[in-house]
């Protein structure tokens, strides 16, 4: 992704850690992409699960927020829970999970 961004002037990413986490990529390997992002998706995820409950999430969003601050991230952030019969995305209460992440993000101290 970083190479493609370098080849296309003005191209930015919508960054969603859950897609990388699902395939087992650690947060530290995803972080270099933050500097190229203009939109960011937040939801719970873990290895093998594209979408997960807040209580089972393995993404360190406190760490991610610090990387965003360090790189001067100024883009949008959206809490993205979806309800579809695919990739276990119909096993969470989307509204409750969205509220949990909203409150978590509001409480972050950087």
Identify the function of each model-found stretch:
Residues 1-14, 21-110:
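Histidine-acidic metal/acid-base catalytic patches
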